[in-house]
C-alpha cells in the first residue's frame, strides 16, 4: 500500500481560555481549545529578546473532549497530537476559512503541568488518548532484546470506544463566528 502523505500535528502550548464543550446530536462531546505556542529569539540588530506567539484552534472529540472540559483550564500546558484540517463556510456571501487541529480516535492529549489556581487537575503528566494504550511497564520492564530498563509507571486513562466525528465539515454544529 502506497503512502500518499502524512498529516500529523504535534503542539505543546498553553490554553488561552477554558475549553468550550458542546454535545452534538448523536450525543458525542466536542471541545474547542485555543492553544498558544511561542518562540523566542535574540534580534541580531538590536540584541533584544523577541517573542512570537501563534494561536491554534484545536478540536477534541468524544471522551477526550469530556476530559478536557473537566480538567483543563486557562493557562494549562498541554501536549496535543492530531491532524490539520481546513474547513470553509459561507457568511453573507463571503467564503470564510478556518484551519484547525482535529484530535480524533488516533490523537492524544496530555496535560503537562498545572495552571495557577487549578484545583481539579489530575496528576502532572496525566495522558489521555483516544486509542487504547498498552499497560505501562513495571520498574523492571524489558526492552527488545532482553535489556532491562527502569520505567516510570504512568497512569494512562483507558477510554471507552470512541464515537467517530460526524462526516462533513461542520462537525455537527454551526459556528457563525469561527473564533
Curated annotation (Swiss-Prot):
Ranges of compositional bias, category Basic residues: 145-155
Function of the molecule: May contribute to the conjugative processing of DNA. It has a functional relationship with Psi (plasmid-mediated sos inhibition) proteins.
A Pfam family this chain is assigned to: SSB
InterPro entries found in the cross-reference section: NA-bd_OB-fold (IPR012340), Primosome_PriB/ssb (IPR000424), ssDNA-bd (IPR011344)
Assembly mode: Homotetramer.
Keywords noted in UniProt: DNA replication, DNA-binding, Plasmid
Residues covered by the SSB domain: 6-110
DNA-binding found in the keyword field: yes
Biased composition (Polar residues): 118-132
Region feature Disordered, mapped onto this chain: 114-179
Gene Ontology biological process terms from the UniProt entry: DNA replication
Alphabetized GO MF terms: single-stranded DNA binding
SUPFAM superfamilies: Nucleic acid-binding proteins
Protein name: Plasmid-derived single-stranded DNA-binding protein
Residue intervals passing through the bilayer: none
DNA-binding positions: 55-61
Presence of the UniProt keyword DNA-binding in the record: yes
Cellular component, GO annotation: nucleoid
Acidic residues bias: start-end ranges: 167-179
Superkingdom of this protein's organism: Bacteria
Amino acid at each position: 500500500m502506497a503512502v500518499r502523505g502524512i498529516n500529523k500535528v504535534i503542539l505543546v502550548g498553553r490554553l488561552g481560555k477554558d475549553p468550550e464543550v458542546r454535545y452534538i446530536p448523536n450525543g458525542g462531546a466536542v471541545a474547542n481549545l485555543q492553544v498558544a505556542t511561542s518562540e523566542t529569539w535574540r534580534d541580531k540588530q538590536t540584541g533584544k529578546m523577541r517573542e512570537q506567539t501563534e494561536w491554534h484552534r484545536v478540536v477534541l472529540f468524544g471522551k477526550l473532549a469530556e476530559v478536557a472540559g473537566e480538567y483543563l483550564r486557562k493557562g494549562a500546558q498541554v501536549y496535543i497530537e492530531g491532524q490539520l484540517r481546513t474547513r470553509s463556510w459561507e457568511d453573507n456571501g463571503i467564503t470564510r476559512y478556518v484551519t484547525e487541529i482535529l484530535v480524533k480516535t488516533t490523537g492524544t492529549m496530555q496535560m503537562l503541568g498545572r495552571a495557577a489556581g487549578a484545583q481539579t487537575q489530575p496528576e502532572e503528566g496525566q495522558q489521555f488518548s483516544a486509542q487504547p494504550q498498552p499497560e505501562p511497564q513495571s520498574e523492571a520492564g524489558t526492552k527488545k532484546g532482553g535489556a532491562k530498563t527502569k520505567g516510570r509507571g504512568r497512569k494512562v486513562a483507558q477510554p471507552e470506544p470512541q464515537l467517530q466525528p460526524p462526516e462533513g465539515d461542520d462537525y455537527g454544529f454551526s459556528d457563525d463566528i469561527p473564533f
